[in-house]
Amino acid sequence: MRLLFIFLFCLLSITFVYGDTKTVHKNPGSDKGANVVYPVPPISNERLFYVQRTPNANTIVYDLNLNSDGKLNTEQPVKVYWLKYAEKGQKEELNYIQRKFAYGLTAKALNNGNYDIRFVSYKKFPLTLMRTGDGKYHIFALIAQKQVILNRIFVKIEGGSFWLPNVMYVEVKGSDPLTGREIVERFKP
């Protein structure tokens, strides 16, 4: 009976802190950091994808950057910010070092109206921002040898330093634009 009470208390605590318990990710890999809950950021019409990583639930969000008239900001088409779930869940801008050396993006306009998007810290993973037939913008990536809509990236880090973290793997998740089926790939950068 006591164990049941403890289990229910923990379940209710998670629900209170993060909302619906169905909107969380478990830590892929589940060894160090297995007790970290990775909430799914709130749904937004501008959401492109988000990145989560050990050692905490703080999430880096990548949204479409629209001007006040609702059109794409062609100079900086993606805005990047934190959701600090490990604190109070507040939204915060990336600092200069995070933006220029870690989680920021570069964007280069292509002739066809699309954008070549790259992480400043890992340029070997090309992304493409493009408008699809439904008129919405999405970030596309090559995942498991398929061009899919990128939804989430999880980075498993064990040790190292800020400037040179020991990345065990990167897990990328996306959805097939034709079937909606989830596609997942894990790689070591």
Regions found by a protein language model. Give the residues of each.
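Short, exposed beta-strand-loop hairpins at the edges of beta-sheets
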Residues: 160-185
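Mature extracytoplasmic domains of secretory-pathway proteins
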Residues: 82-150
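Short, solvent-exposed, Trp/other aromatic-anchored flexible loops in extracytoplasmic proteins
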Residues: 149-157
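Structural signature of eukaryotic scaffold interfaces centered on beta-propeller domains
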Residues: 39-42, 107-110, 163
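N-terminal export/targeting and maturation segments
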Residues: 20-94, 182
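Short, solvent-exposed mixed-charge patches
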Residues: 20, 188-189
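Bacterial Sec-dependent N-terminal signal peptides
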Residues: 1-25
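Short linear motifs in intrinsically disordered
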Residues: 107, 128-129, 156-164
